[in-house]
Amino acid sequence: MRTFVSGGKTVTVFPAGVPDAPVVYLNTFGDEGQKVFDALASCGCPPLSLVAVSGLDWNHDMAPWDCPAVFKNAESFTGGADESLRLLAGEILPRAERELAGTPRWRGIAGYSLAGLFALYALYKSDVFSRAASVSGSLWFPGFREYVFSHAPKRRPDRVYFSVGDRESKTKNPVRQTVQENTVAICGI
């Protein structure tokens, strides 16, 4: 495991231990990279390297554009995803992959909640990832469904994983109520 700081973000590289293993980039809310890497190993996943990025300003770094707060007493979203993606693809990725043995067979991006939204958004703004996982992605984000339907990914991904909880849309918040409907619609394209 190696850790470095880039653009104010803490980056932890968990090498697979075998050459040319796939690599997954995971934007984390806290610092759960080690737990995720250990869980992947314990459940018998094929070897892969994990690059966990933490120290994020969640409502800025993961949001594709400005948007007023959708939760009571919450901060607004300040649309820094393009900047975050430039940092990830331009600085973090090359430095992290110098720590790996060989060349990754494929490169994926994954995230939970707003980071799941960011993972999908990255496919539309960059061609560096061939796979993505949006785990309980914030696909309720205003305008995102329309964005996906009016734009094409920079490259056709090999695989995309979506998940949404059974009760995520069962909320009084009218914006968040759209999460399941939006996830199903986006998954269908």
Region locations from a protein language model:
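N-terminal cap/lid segment of alpha/beta-hydrolase-fold proteins
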Residues: M1-A16
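Serine-hydrolase catalytic machinery in alpha/beta-hydrolase-like enzymes
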Residues: T12, D20-E99
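A general structural motif
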Residues: D20-P22, P47, P104-W106, F129, ...
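A conserved amphipathic alpha-helix that caps or lines the catalytic cleft of carbohydrate-
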Residues: L40-A41, L123, C187
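Short beta-strand immediately N-terminal to the catalytic nucleophile in serine-hydrolase-like folds
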Residues: W106-G111, V135
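Gly/Ala-rich beta-loop-alpha elbow adjacent to hydrolase catalytic centers
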Residues: A110-A115, A119
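Conserved hydrolase catalytic core segment
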Residues: Y121-R131
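The feature captures the conserved acid-bearing segment of alpha/beta-hydrolase catalytic domains
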Residues: L139-I189
